[in-house]
Swiss-Prot record:
Keywords: ATP-binding, Magnesium, Nucleotide-binding, Transferase, tRNA processing. It catalyses: adenosine(37) in tRNA + dimethylallyl diphosphate = N(6)-dimethylallyladenosine(37) in tRNA + diphosphate. SUPFAM superfamilies: P-loop containing nucleoside triphosphate hydrolases. It comes from Listeria monocytogenes serotype 4a (strain HCC23). Residues 36-39 are annotated as: Interaction with substrate tRNA. The keyword Transferase applies. Gene3D superfamilies: 1.10.20.140, P-loop containing nucleotide triphosphate hydrolases. ATP binds at G11, P12, T13, A14, V15, G16, K17, T18. This is tRNA dimethylallyltransferase. The keyword Phosphoprotein does not apply. Catalyzes the transfer of a dimethylallyl group onto the adenine at position 37 in tRNAs that read codons beginning with uridine, leading to the formation of N6-(dimethylallyl)adenosine (i(6)A). The gene is miaA.
Amino acid sequence: MSKIPVIVIVGPTAVGKTSLSIELAKRLDGEIISGDSMQVYRGLDIGTAKITPEEMGGIKHYLIDVTDPSVPFTAAKFQSETRKAIETIHQAGKLPIIVGGTGLYIQSVFYDYDFGNASEDKAYRAKLEQLDKVILWQMLEQQDPESARQIHENNKRRVIRALEVMHLTGKPFSEYQVHNVLNDTYKPLFLGLDLDRELLYERINQRVNLMFEQGLITEAKKLYEQHLVDVPAVRGIGYKELFPYFERKSSLEEAKELIQKNSRHFAKRQLTWFRNRMDIDWIQAGVSSTESEALNKATTFLTAK
C-alpha cells in the first residue's frame, strides 16, 4: 500500500502560512486541514486570526469551527480527526494540506505519538485542581522530570493530566510521548516559513492592531460574560489579556501591549519548537519567491518516486 502524500506548512504566527496554503491548494488541487489548536472553536474568530470564508477562496477546509469553547479539543482528538480528514481528502483524489503553528498537534499526526489513554480518576483530579500550579509542577518535576521539562508550569491542565496518568498507571507520562519514527501511513513534506525577527515582530504588532479594529474587544467580552474565562479555549493569547481590562484592573492600552508581547514570545517559542523537533524544509517568507519556491519543492516532492 502506497503512502499518502501530505504537504504540511508550519511556522510562527503572522508569518504568512494561510495565504501560502491557499495558493498551493489551488495549484495542486488540494484541500486544507487547520493545524491550529484554537481555530477548532466556534466564536473564537478574531483573536485566533481564523481564516474567513472569503479568504478560503473556494478551498474546502477541515477542523475549523468544530466545537464550542466550553468543550476541550485535545491533541489526541486532533490526531484522530486529522487522520480521518487526510483519508477523506485522499479518497476524493485531492492533496491533503495541513497548515498551522501548533507543533505538538501536527507532530502527533505523523509520528507514533501515544497520549497515554488512561481512564480518569475524577476524585484524584479534583484534589489536584485545588493545588497551586507551582506546587503541581514541582510534584511533576519530582515524579517525572522529563515531562516537567516539556510542560510549562502555567499549563495547569496538562500538568494535572500527567500526574493523573502516573497515578492511574504507575508509569511516567513522558514514556507515553512521541517516538521519533514517522507513521508508515503518510509521506509528509514539512515546509516551514521563516522571516527576519524584526519584520515578524512588526507583522505581529500590526496584526494585533487589526484585531482590535475588527472587534476583538467585543469577541472577548462575550466570552467573559458567558463565564468562560477559565476554559482552555480562552486561555490562548488575545483573550485572557483583556479580562483584567473588563474588571478595571488594567487599561486597554496595557491589554493591547500585553497581547503583542505575548504573541511575540509565542512566535519565538514556535520557531524554537519546530527547529528542534521536526525535520523541516525552511523557506524565506515575505519575498517575491516565497510561493514559487514552495510550489517547486511541493511539485518535486509529489513527483518523486
